[in-house]
Amino acid sequence: ANLLAAMENEQADFVSSSRTLCRLDGSVMGPCPLTDPERFIDTNAMLFGRGAFPLLHQWVLMPDYGHLIGDRVMLHHLKESGVKRHHLDQESVFYRCAKEGLYGQMNEAIPEGVQPRPDYEASFVCWEADGLPPLR
């Protein structure tokens, strides 16, 4: 509701927020330290308004290597498009962490059952090899 209200109040085409990171058991670790409206917004914390709908095809058409970094790819296209963006400096999503990387960043013990950290770096290298600007 907060994102939708912000979209209306700010007359924005796209609104984003941060996320609250949770352990596999659902208990809260805290706010995501990675959220930066210029560099990284998790897909779960993105709200596309009608003015940003024409960009949604980028999700479908991104190269296979891009899916691992799809949230950054979409943020790139949003920024390039010039649509009016607004970021709420608050958490709107509870994100259950199933990959080990976020546990390390939160100084948490890595629990059993989480996936190893994916090779994001390989995707960034492929993106840049295609002549696109760095997303890191």
How would you name each of these model-derived features?
Residues 1-136:
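Nucleotide-sugar donor-binding/catalytic module of glycosyltransferases
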